[in-house]
């Protein structure tokens, strides 16, 4: 029997509980969780990653819910999905994907994957990389050496 594969994608810059929640919830949808980590040069919809792609990949690979982690393709985001052939593709609550458009693009490539948007992580006030960076800047900018 073929394993039910789930693909999750993201930048995963400065890992935080929101990322772990997204990947944990994604893993519940199948037998194997494959994570595609965005390449540095492909992150265009938000500030460039602070951590280089190899380091982000290593961090994601070390997380318990993750069975396989790979870097995305340099030019075509669907190439790894063509190879993995997932049953499900998950999208984070704040990822810039139109689910219907994505379903259409998958259908054009004969990839009948279900598309599922994972909800927002609600526990804690530092559940985004942006908020973590902001807290660090505020703490260091004020001369306070503590972060917390």
Curated annotation (Swiss-Prot):
EC number of the protein: 2.7.7.2
Pathway the protein contributes to: Cofactor biosynthesis; FAD biosynthesis; FAD from FMN: step 1/1
Keyword Nucleotide-binding included in the entry's annotation: yes
Molecular function GO labels: ATP binding; FMN adenylyltransferase activity
Cofactor: a divalent metal cation
Superkingdom field: Archaea
Biological processes annotated in GO: FAD biosynthetic process; FMN metabolic process
Residues annotated for ATP binding in this entry: 11-12, 16-19, 94, 121
A Pfam family hit: CTP_transf_like
Key words, A-Z: ATP-binding, FAD, Flavoprotein, FMN, Nucleotide-binding, Nucleotidyltransferase, Transferase
Biological role: Catalyzes the transfer of the AMP portion of ATP to flavin mononucleotide (FMN) to produce flavin adenine dinucleotide (FAD) coenzyme.
Assembly mode: Homodimer.
Record-stated family: Belongs to the archaeal FAD synthase family.
Name assigned to this protein: FAD synthase
Source organism: Methanoregula boonei (strain DSM 21154 / JCM 14090 / 6A8)
Lineage of origin: Archaea, Methanobacteriati, Methanobacteriota, Stenosarchaea group, Methanomicrobia
Gene label: ribL
């Amino acid at each position: 029997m073929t394993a039910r594969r789930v693909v999750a994608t993201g930048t995963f810059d400065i890992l935080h509980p929101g990322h772990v929640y997204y990947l944990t919830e994604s893993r519940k949808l199948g037998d194997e969780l494959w994570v595609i980590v965005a390449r540095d040069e492909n992150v265009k919809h938000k500030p460039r990653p602070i951590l280089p792609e190899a380091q982000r990949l290593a961090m994601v690979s070390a997380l318990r819910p993750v069975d396989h982690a790979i870097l995305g393709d340099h030019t075509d985001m669907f190439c790894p999905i063509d190879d993995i052939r997932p049953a499900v593709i998950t999208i984070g609550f704040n990822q810039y994907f139109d689910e219907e458009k994505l379903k259409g693009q998958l259908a054009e490539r004969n990839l009948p994957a279900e598309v599922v948007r994972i909800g927002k992580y609600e526990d804690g006030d530092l559940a985004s990389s942006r908020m973590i960076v902001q807290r660090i800047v505020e703490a260091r900018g004020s001369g306070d050496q503590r972060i917390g």
